[in-house]
Design a protein with these regions (language model features):
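Short, Lys/Arg-enriched N-terminal segments with co-localized hydrophobic residues
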Residues: 7-28
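Structural/interface elements that position substrates and couple domains in central-metabolism enzymes
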Residues: 28-484
Length: 484
């Protein structure tokens, strides 16, 4: 088979056995070692793939068609690349093949357009030898011990290794600690006899997808790329340059991995700062939101971050733990980062304390009180509940005997969340009506979706605890709105 193959691995997936005629076992692989003499000339592997990329003839494969992988697939499909998407979830595959979507910011119309331009979805992982390049962007969660869980990355690399052929480009996109590409992915890919930088090419380029962001999307967000060696870097830069507005090459995969960890840790520690100031300023009778709005009028030296009920999403609450873990492996302590994590983790307890105080002021205990949580997605106007602080808030309120329910126009049913003690709630979003609002003892604003009419909610709810400053400017009797 001439030329190289490109495989992009991205998204939210759950790996068991890969489906298809030749399934990959979870713990064992059968990889054929190819003698060097049987390989194509190594000198012929690099240039043909560069040419195919520039002519947009290279086929792009994406494993994991979730919040990262599907927008990435669209970015390449829109530029004329044939895209083959992989996912172990056959339901997702069937829906995509029908031109349907399951992600809010990638509409069915967009998916139909992708299909018309040659996009194909499959759950048959033995087809991994068909694309011309490989990008890995599978989830990288934490274990119960809050340590890096690279299961999805490792299983993806094993799946690729079984089908890997000379000339393919593999790019890891999953957020992870510096060293993962070289120390974890490379040895797995080389287990069949092919050598990175000679027989196939390897790079790291961190995903920067921001679901729900109408200003920035996959094609417009600059792409940082670090190659294992110069030819791998050249190929990865050439590939992303075809679909992205800007590509930023760095010296190594480790530099690119460290870049993403820096970005997310920077955000986490600054949110921790304003969360701590929120607690302090509240004690002093100062509105932290007013202070931030005033401070951001300074045209230099200040960037606004906002407090909230806790961190959410698949990156910000998790990635700093990857950095602290690898720091400990090097005999160092990241005290500042770990302290920020403690502050952010404490926010749900702080909010529940404010709810309890507000109810006590009305002569009611938390136990037995009806509390409606508004918004269970981790941020505004997305349908992603991963790591949402709403789950911890719900846990804490249930433990104190509250009667809890929720409304979220984007989350019709709560998914099972393994971290939580009451994770099998099987709770569905309640309709937001005048009668339901009036029947609650407290309405807790967790996520400020734009679909909510705050004046209407304030009018009919007896008590509101607002963690997002969503009710700013809304007239209400004194004490009806409590900021937390």
């Amino acid at each position: 088979m001439g030329g190289g193959h490109l495989l992009l691995i991205a998204g939210s997936v759950s790996f068991g056995n890969f489906k298809g005629q030749r399934p990959l076992p979870r713990t064992t692989m059968s990889i054929t070692t190819i003698p060097p003499g049987d390989l194509e000339s190594r000198a012929d592997l690099h240039r043909p793939l560069v040419a195919r990329i520039h002519k947009r003839l290279a086929r792009v494969g994406i494993i994991g068609l979730g919040y990262v992988g599907l927008p990435l697939a669209r970015a390449f499909a829109d530029k004329g690349f044939a895209v083959l998407g992989f996912d172990v979830d056959s339901t997702k595959v069937i829906r995509l093949q029908r031109g349907e979507s399951y992600i809010g910011h990638v509409t069915a119309e967009m998916v139909r357009g992708m299909r018309e331009r040659g996009f194909e979805a499959t759950d048959r992982f033995y087809r991994l030898d068909e694309p011309d390049a490989i990008l890995i962007c599978v989830p990288t969660p934490l274990t119960e011990a809050r340590e890096p869980d690279l299961t999805y990355v490792i299983e993806s690399a094993k799946g690729i290794a079984e089908q890997l052929r000379p000339g393919q480009l593999v790019v890891l996109e999953s957020t992870t600690y510096p060293g993962t590409t070289r120390q974890v992915v490379q040895p797995i890919l080389e287990s069949g006899g092919l050598k990175a930088g000679e027989d196939f090419f390897l790079a790291f380029s961190p995903e920067r997808e921001d679901p729900g962001n109408s200003k920035f999307s996959a094609p417009t967000i600059p792409k940082v790329v670090g190659g294992l060696e110069p030819r791998s870097l050249e190929l990865a830069v050439a590939l992303y340059s075809q679909a992205m507005a800007a590509v930023v090459p760095v010296s190594s995969p480790e530099a690119a991995e460290a870049c993403k960890i820096l970005e997310n840790t920077y955000r986490a520690v600054n949110i921790a700062l304003v969360n701590e100031l929120k607690v302090l300023y509240d004690r002093m009778g100062i509105d932290v939101w007013e202070v931030i709005e005033a401070a951001k009028t300074k045209p230099f030296g200040f960037q606004a971050f906002y407090p909230g009920p806790g961190l959410g999403g698949h990156c910000i609450p998790i990635d700093p733990f990857y950095l602290t873990w690898v720091a400990h492996k090097h005999g160092l302590a990241t005290r500042f980062i770990e302290l920020a994590g403690e502050i952010n983790t404490a926010m749900p307890s702080y909010v529940v304390g404010k709810v309890a105080d507000a109810l006590n002021d009305r002569g009611k205990p938390v136990k037995g009180s009806k509390i409606l949580l508004l918004g269970m997605a981790y941020k505004r106007d997305v349908d992603d509940p991963r790591e949402s602080p709403g789950f911890e808030l719900m846990e804490l309120l249930l433990e104190r005997g509250a009667v809890v329910n929720y409304n979220d126009p984007h989350i019709p049913v709560l998914p099972d969340m393994r971290r939580y003690r009451h994770h099998r709630l099987h709770m569905a979003s309640q309709g937001l009506t005048v009668g339901h609002l009036r029947s609650q003892d407290c309405v807790l604003i967790v996520t400020d979706h734009s679909a909510y009419s705050w004046p209407w909610i304030v009018e009919h709810a007896p008590l509101i605890v607002d963690t997002r400053n969503a009710t700013r400017g809304v007239a209400a009797p004194e004490g009806k709105i409590v900021r937390a």
